[in-house]
């Protein structure tokens, strides 16, 4: 049964990318032809908050001020933030980055590559990675995201 097969696959993906698991890398060609990978940012000795988002997604746009607050508060203390634009047109992503005043790095034009790898079915989906590349927490939003980042940055 294809539906059961799909559900089993989804469970396996979620197990592989659960809290405590090592990050799964991916590489995306950027509009300028360069290639960028998650591993260019994750497992570099810092906590990294990764926001999987799209320009057309209202809740994604609403989360940006919360991410900006964390970036402003903790970036100088060693927190990195990375945006990964999924399911979106390059020009729409670039326009949204300007409109929203996003200053942290972005992997754009990722489409469904990372969402399939991480079993992400809805966005925004925000994952906090530890300095060693393990997943600290998945699907962080609003106050829960702020609390989790504050907790790890105290250590």
What spans do the regions from the language model cover?
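N-proximal helix/coil linker or "cap" segments that precede and/or mark the start of modular domains
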Residues: 1-31, 36-45, 95-98
């Amino acid at each position: 049964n294809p539906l059961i097969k799909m559900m089993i696959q989804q469970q396996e993906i979620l197990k592989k990318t659960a809290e405590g698991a090592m990050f799964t890398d991916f590489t995306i060609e950027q509009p300028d032809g360069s290639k960028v990978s998650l591993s260019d940012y994750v497992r570099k000795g810092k906590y990294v908050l990764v926001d999987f988002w799209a320009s057309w997604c209202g809740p994604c746009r609403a989360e940006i001020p919360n991410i900006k607050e964390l970036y402003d508060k903790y970036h100088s203390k060693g927190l990195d933030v990375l945006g990964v634009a999924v399911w979106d047109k390059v020009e729409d992503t670039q326009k949204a980055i300007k409109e929203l005043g996003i200053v942290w790095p972005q992997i754009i034009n990722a489409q469904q590559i990372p969402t399939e790898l991480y079993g992400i079915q809805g966005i925004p989906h925000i994952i906090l990675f530890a300095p060693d590349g393990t997943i600290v927490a998945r699907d962080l939003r609003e106050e829960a995201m702020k609390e989790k980042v504050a907790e790890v940055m105290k250590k």
